[in-house]
């Protein structure tokens, strides 16, 4: 299973992801349904603040260069059945990381909680938990990513208000299946979705 890994953001140790998956599958008790990973992290070059009808968002305080890490997702790994028992605010502050697994942050919002969707985002996923700037982000611009790159369920579907020319109008858990988005975000899907896309394309993957 491997030794505990070092948290990139705090220097503390956490349980390796494969250990968490094994624990969830081997022990369905309440204690096994919640496992602490890392806290959410937001670059000091950005700040979470009110964002009108979106609620809150994260905005650049200084210029962020393409390729810079801007946020890291952490929290509790839970299954969909457990996610559905949480209050709506915590459900909205979650990200899907595997077929039936989600990262949910603490009851009190953390700096990295407020990363909104955009159909033409300023950041993209690297792996399942890290966001990097997809282009240069100017002061005052919002840090966003496309939920199509991580979602495969209906837990967070909504009418989009990103305002981009490429806006899809509605964001669903099936958007990752679109050929145009698979081409646009090639290399930037959460690993479990990247594997599924590869399989659908006839590639031999795990």
PLM region spans:
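Catalytic cores of histone-lysine modification enzymes
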Residues: 5, 11, 17-126
């Amino acid at each position: 299973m491997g030794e505990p890994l070092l948290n990139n953001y705090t220097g503390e140790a956490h349980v390796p992801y494969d250990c968490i998956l094994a624990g969830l599958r081997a022990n369905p008790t309440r204690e096994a349904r919640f496992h602490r990973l890392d806290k959410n992290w937001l670059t000091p070059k950005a700040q979470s603040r009110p964002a009108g009808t979106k609620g809150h968002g994260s905005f650049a305080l200084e210029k962020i260069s393409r390729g810079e890490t801007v946020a890291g997702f952490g929290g509790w790994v839970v299954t969909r059945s457990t996610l559905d028992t949480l209050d709506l605010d915590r459900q909205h502050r979650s990200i899907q990381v595997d077929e039936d697994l989600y990262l949910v942050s603490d009851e009190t919002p953390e700096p990295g909680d407020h990363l909104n969707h955009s159909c033409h985002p300023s950041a993209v996923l690297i792996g399942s938990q890290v966001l990097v700037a997809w282009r240069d982000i100017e002061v005052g611009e919002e840090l966003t990513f496309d939920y199509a790159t991580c979602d495969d369920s209906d837990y967070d579907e909504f009418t989009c208000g990103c305002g981009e020319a490429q806006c899809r109008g509605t964001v669903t858990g099936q958007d990752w299946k679109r050929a145009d988005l698979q081409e646009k975000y090639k290399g930037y899907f959460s690993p479990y979705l990247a594997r599924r896309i590869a399989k659908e394309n006839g590639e031999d993957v795990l």
